[in-house]
Amino acid sequence: MNSLQLLDYFAMFAYFLVLIWIGVAVVRSKEKRNQYDSFLAADRNMNLLQTTSSAAATDIGGGFSIAMGGLGFTLGLSGSWMIAVSGLSIVMVSFLMVPKVKRWSDKVKGLTTGDLFAARFDRKTGTLAAVVIGLAWFTFVGGQIIAGGKLLQVTLNMNLTFAVLLSGTIILAYTTMGGLKAVIYTDVFQMIVLMVGIVFIAVPIGLIEIGGWNVLVEKFNSSESTKHLLDWGAVGWRQMLGWFFAVFPVWFISIAAMQRIIAARDVKTAQRGFFLTGIPIEWPLFAVGSTMIGLIARFLIPDLSDPEL
């Protein structure tokens, strides 16, 4: 095992140690004013950093982080437009939805989307909404669990099935013990790691490794099969339209987004946090940065069997 491998394992160990410490600290915290408010809505006291980080981490967590690298590998820079659509969506939500939802949730003291439906209509409607939301979220949470499993598979050389089961157990146990407050504190830490890792570490080191941006451009432009990787319009309008219909509505119906709005300190904090998530975090920092990692991987390992790994 060389020094780089040792450094990698040390970094992963330190990362998970910090996450465990955050969860334990939240569970043992005596600052909870109300048990349910703390568990479901983080005491309705999220500041701007927490709101922004948690909203961003909700969208660009493990699933998108892995997927965008894969899009960068196969589609190149134009793959970043998928996240640009998401960024546009959340900016629109910050103006059109955030103020109304935040004021309404504070007025009726609702802690969940089901509570808001119950307050607006009746208890049966609220219960039905909660059931539908729970069923729908199996798919989203499943994507995050699979992303975590793939990470464990690659980094620790695990069987994929076992890695996914382990990932799911950790995620569910962590959330159940610490509630939304633990998730939010974790989101802040993870967003710092993610953005610093992509923008200031992975991309610069990758470009240095291949000899710089000009070398990458020269190599990809030298072949017809890779020229499209540097073309911002390579995906075409049909693909863009598909992304728009698939991605743009998500923030308007996202239960995770609703929960972050409810948990924010006030309307202004929620609105600013969501806007900053769209611009500049999702676009251009994460979108371009993550696709650049895929491009660099295409340069270094063109025959990679699974672009998402």
Question: Across the structure, where does each feature detected by a protein language model lie?
Answer:
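Membrane-interface "cap" regions at the ends of multi-pass membrane proteins
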Residues: 1-66, 175-178, 269, 275-276
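Short amphipathic alpha-helical coupling elements at transmembrane boundaries
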Residues: 38-41, 115-122, 130, 154, ...
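TM-loop-TM module centered on a large, flexible mid-protein loop between adjacent transmembrane helices
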Residues: 117-119, 296-309
